[in-house]
Amino acid sequence: MFKKNLVILVGIMALLLAGGSQALAGKKIINGIDANFPPFAFIDQKGVPSGFDVEAMNWIAKEMGYEVEHKPFDWDGIITSLLTKKIDMVASGMSITAERLEKVSFTNPYWKIKQVMVVKKDSTLTLDDLLKGKKMVGVQQGTSEAKWLKEAAEKNGWNLELRYYESSPLAVEDILNGRIAAAAMDDAPAKDAADKKDVKILGTFGMESEDFGYAVRKEDTQLLKDMNEGLKRLMASDYWKELVKKYDLK
């Protein structure tokens, strides 16, 4: 009788452990994206979320046993949306910064970016003209470059004027319309804009390069572990190379 009960108990424990290890398998997660951040995240012509990060997350979700839904959110409040559980993660070109690390956890980095100034293609403005010549410079609010430029201007006595936008593409449109002289943004979306619009990349402006990572809530340790493992597998796969080539990332 004892042996029989022991076998039953061991069987029950095995089932419980198996269930626990698969507790997250098949779980639906909501990924918050900046829908105006090509080539990493955007809404395509069919009205469907697309981009490098969207396709990467689709692959990782399938690989790690998740179902993922991508939802556009205002970038300036996307960390708040994560903390209040409106979304489960942010895989959408988010820089890993000390300020953000105080609130959320990040995966291992998957892409390194630098910040640049974008101007009209026929512009003769120099970087000094933009930083010291009372020029209007556009920047997406809630970004690390917006914070850096504001602090650097105060520290260095630059007299540029900052105008804040909901997205980098809106700032690019105002460059073309003559409302602002330039816009500061990450180099990948800047290249995307230069390929499609009558603008060019003027160059970097002194801000150090940053790493992109996926953000999750600090308490979601299993999700963080799974995303790190998924990224590791993805970056070792041929599909990673295909995505990099498809979205012309360098």
Regions found by a protein language model. Give the residues of each.
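Extracytoplasmic small-molecule ligand-binding "clamshell" domains
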Residues: 25-93
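Extended ligand-binding regions for polar small-molecule ligands
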Residues: 54-63, 122-128, 134-144, 213-250
